UniProtKB/Swiss-Prot annotation:
Its EC number is 2.7.8.13. GO terms for cellular component: plasma membrane. The keyword Cell cycle applies. NCBIfam families: mraY. Catalyzes the initial step of the lipid cycle reactions in the biosynthesis of the cell wall peptidoglycan: transfers peptidoglycan precursor phospho-MurNAc-pentapeptide from UDP-MurNAc-pentapeptide onto the lipid carrier undecaprenyl phosphate, yielding undecaprenyl-pyrophosphoryl-MurNAc-pentapeptide, known as lipid I. Disulfide bonds: none annotated. Keywords: Cell cycle, Cell division, Cell inner membrane, Cell membrane, Cell shape, Cell wall biogenesis/degradation, Magnesium, Membrane, Metal-binding, Peptidoglycan synthesis, Transferase, Transmembrane, Transmembrane helix. The chain crosses the membrane at residues 19-39, 49-69, 92-112, 116-136, 156-176, 183-203, 215-235, 238-258, 279-299, 345-365. One of its GO terms (molecular function) is phosphotransferase activity, for other substituted phosphate groups. The gene is mraY. This is Phospho-N-acetylmuramoyl-pentapeptide-transferase. InterPro entries: Glycosyl_transferase_4, PNAcMuramoyl-5peptid_Trfase, PNAcMuramoyl-5peptid_Trfase_CS. Its cofactor is Mg(2+).
Length: 365
């Protein structure tokens, strides 16, 4: 009934995947246009940020045209959960591990484009580190043809390990005021507590983007908008990392060219863990954890929906060991699917919400 109802909706209420790709481009460029009033930003006036976005998107889309068929030939197909939305069963056979081509491309372009800037190299290594964790997880899933890759403890250990290495580097080579968090016009000195917050942010953000990757074009599109927003926030103080963010945004948009509904490839944990780790690393290095929190509102909502679902189920568990569910299914995008929303309605709505969050983050920075 939900499918029949959605198919009869006007096209503007039930957009196609290609329409969402155009919307994503429009939103990303509109956000960048907000920088036009910042005349003291040479990296904007000479077009470097726009070039980073557009060039990376083009290269990623072109490389994807070669890599996606290779993933199909390698039979790197996503294992679809039988207890998920029934509409997802038709996705069986779609290759995964798409992060293997768009993440390294974006990092490489950012490193070369900033003339091997040390900050970009370090953040790039963090990004590739989280990508490697995701790749191992994806490979295990494909190898054993199940949804069980790395165990939660193994994945958490590796995520924390990379976070600790990154924080150790920042401790010795980062700015002295790195432990201060700016919240609008206020400065909150955290001291040693900052390193615990930073480690948590890296692990939580990478897991949050991973949870968001459940609908065609969702994680990559919201990731692109988040990277553009974060790039705008850090452009004045660290133009090199702004370039990195725009390159990552371009990589995400180039990937959406292949991942919009109906998806020809999924990013897998290879891509989704890298997105969160990358966003968090930039936010931590530039002291923009408050801005990161706002820009990551969609990812935060996805994570909180899972936490609430699990917590409510355990709290209401009866003698028979069965509890009640707060949502029809978690994360929240699956709840919306089971409530009659189409994938493209969810994705389009989340794109718009994430754009508003990015604007709020800039306004309160």
């Amino acid at each position: 009934m939900a499918n029949a109802k959605s198919s009869s909706l006007p096209s503007w209420k039930n957009p196609s995947g290609k329409t969402l790709l155009i919307l994503l481009w429009a939103l990303a460029l509109a956000l960048m246009a907000l920088l036009s009033s910042w005349a003291d930003m040479p990296w904007l006036s000479n077009g470097k940020l726009l070039i980073a976005l557009g060039f990376t998107a083009l290269v990623t889309a072109l490389i994807g045209m070669a890599v996606v068929p290779m993933l199909v030939n390698l039979k790197a197909s996503q294992v679809i959960q039988s207890d998920g939305p029934q509409s997802h069963l038709k996705k069986a056979g779609t290759p995964t591990m798409g992060g293997i081509f768009f993440v390294p491309v974006a990092v490489a372009i950012a490193v070369v484009g900033t003339q091997f800037n040390p900050d970009v190299i370090v953040v790039g290594l963090v990004t590739l580190g989280y990508m490697a964790i995701g790749w191992v997880d994806d490979w295990q899933i494909l190898k054993y043809k199940s949804n069980k890759g790395l165990t939660p403890k193994q994945k958490l250990f590796l995520q924390v390990a990379i976070a600790v290495i990154f924080c150790t580097w920042l401790f010795f080579y980062g700015p002295t005021e790195i432990t201060d968090i700016r919240i609008m016009q206020f400065v909150l000195p955290l001291g040693f507590l900052f390193w615990l917050v930073a480690t948590f942010a890296l692990v939580a953000e990478s897991n949050a983007t991973n949870l968001t990757d459940g609908v065609d074009g969702l994680a990559a599109g919201t990731g692109a908008i988040a990277f553009v927003g974060l790039g705008l926030l850090v452009a004045k103080e660290n133009p090199a990392l702004a370039f990195f963010c725009c390159a990552m945004a371009g990589g995400c948009i180039g990937f959406v060219h292949h991942n919009h509904n109906p998806a020809r490839v999924f990013m897998g944990d290879t891509g989704s863990l890298a997105l969160g780790g990358s966003l968090a690393a930039v936010g931590i290095m530039t002291g923009n954890l408050w801005g990161l929190l706002l820009i990551s509102g969609i990812f935060l909502a996805e994570s909180l929906s899972v936490i609430a679902q699990v917590g409510y189920y355990k709290a209401t568990k009866g003698p028979d060991g069965v509890g009640k569910r707060l949502l029809k299914m978690a994360p929240i995008h699956h709840h919306l699917e089971l409530s009659g929303w189409t994938e493209t309605q969810i994705v389009g709505s989340f794109y718009l919400i994430n754009t508003l969050l990015a604007i709020v983050a800039m306004a309160t920075a």
